[in-house]
Amino acid sequence: LLQLVKKRLKEQKGMTLIELLAVIVILGIISAIAIPSILGLIDNSKKDAHVANARQMINSAKLAVTGDSSLQPPDDKTPVYVTLKYLQDKGYIETVKDPDGKGYSAGDGSAGTSKPESGSYVMISSTSGKLSYSVYLTNGTRSIKDASGNPVPEDQLSRDNVR
């Protein structure tokens, strides 16, 4: 009996067409499940990188305020806006790498009480002398902003704000 089984195994040349089709179908099902999951992970990683860049921008603005008192809001009702280009030009931050590969819109290099018309910026506001920071970071396709299109406060930064 053992010799008969060995003989049959030696005579078997390969897999049948049905067996090959079954393997291909199984691999197709596995890839159909796995690919969307992997793409979702990649997108979430990019969103997390945008959030990290926004935090880096806020930290740079904090350094700028410490070094330049003219960047502090004049009163509780008037915020100060500091563009990404201003932070880069003054050496508070290196050029920020956009995970989407497009490059961030850096703005016009201004800092003051006028809201920038375009580009990325940090908004510095004061409440009873306590400074708070909000960030708007855009690359033309995706931006860090709230549902109304306004800058996101520092304590609310998350991947949900990447729109």
Task: Give residue ranges: language-model regions.
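N-terminal single-pass transmembrane signal-anchor helix
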Residues: 13-39
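Aliphatic-rich helix starts adjacent to a transmembrane/signal segment
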Residues: 12, 39-59
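Mobile, glycine-rich extracellular loop/lid and propeptide segments
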Residues: 66
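Short, surface-exposed interaction loops/tails
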Residues: 114-163
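N-terminal leader/signal peptides at the extreme start of proteins
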Residues: 1-15
